[in-house]
Amino acid sequence: MIWSLYVELGQNMWFCEDPKLDFEDAAWDILLENAVKYGINQIVLDLGEGVQYKSHPELAKEGAWSCDRVRAELERCRKLGIELIPKLNFSATHHMWLGEYRRMMSTSIYYKVCRDLIEEVAELFDHPAYIHIGMDEEGDAQFFEEMDMVHYRQGELIWHDLRYLCDCVLSCGAKPWIWADMCMYEPEAFRRHIPYDDVILSPWVYFAIRREHWTLVKSKQRYIDSNEGKMGVEYMEEAPIWQTMTREGVIAANDGYKTVPCCSVWGECEYCSDDVIEHFYNNCDKENLLGFMTAPWVRTDMKSIDNIVLSMQKLAEARAKFVESK
């Protein structure tokens, strides 16, 4: 099974463009050491502006990895038993890294840039089994107040662009991997446009699932101030996003979509990893459940390394309890 860790190389996927990467090599070294310790066999590396792309060098920021550095880290990970998977997020709420091209979304120039980058990354990563293309939270209003330009796709345009991006990946011999939002929220339309064999889905659940583990909104100020808190719910898990991901993620897997559910320590919920692995492992068709991922959603730096290690530890503990003990 896949036991994956999401890692940030680039960081310009949110709100503003930083001119310099915060990525720290010392944190990366500790991360890899602990990945081996905790049985991580795959890292999904969010590239963004963190690579000096030959096709579009204008996207790289200070501190971006050279192509030689990417190849060296790919080989380093292989020797550790870790598969390094590239990620490029093309969602309209997470594409600050595309620079001026984000303002050209759904134009011929944009499509060419997307294809150029996907093809280069496929070659650079030695033709990986998967290429993650993001596509989460497209049109999510919570991002609009912070963004300097608000535009997103909907209707047939979003399905056209998702299909195009998937086809770019498939033409490179890889399988496109996406966050499961579009399938979770529009399951019928998704099934019409994207066949079961054309994509890997990651439903993401960052709080508990078992009712006895639910998280009181009033227990933390960050919960009170969150979107869930503003809804007036008593527990974080009552919010539609978590109910939908929990329910539709299982349905999609049992319908035939290959699935890698994602947990996280981001929500500060001590039961998240356990509940996500228990729920999806016990309820999904095992043939379609490829494995699990954890995403700490922090920069790869020494300030955040403890959180990254905790993510791997929680995933390993849940794996031992609910998968290896079976």
Annotate each predicted stretch with a short phrase.
Residues P86-G99, P128-G139, W177-C183, S219-E238, ...:
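Short secondary-structure transition/capping segments
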Residues F144-E146, H213-W214, I305-D306:
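Short aromatic-enriched loop/helix-cap "lid" or pocket-rim segments at secondary-structure transitions
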Residues D255-K326:
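Substrate-binding cleft of secreted/luminal carbohydrate-active enzymes
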Residues E24-D29, A64-V70, Y110-R115, Q154-Y164, ...:
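Well-ordered, non-membrane alpha-helical segments in soluble/globular domains
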Residues M1-W3:
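Extreme N-terminal starter segment of soluble prokaryotic enzymes
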Residues P187-V265:
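Glycoside hydrolase catalytic-domain groove-lining segments
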Residues A141-Q142, Y185-E188, I209-E212, E268-E270, ...:
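Short acidic/glycine-rich loop or secondary-structure boundary segments that cap or lie
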Residues Y6-I200, V205:
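Aromatic-lined carbohydrate-binding surfaces of glycoside hydrolases
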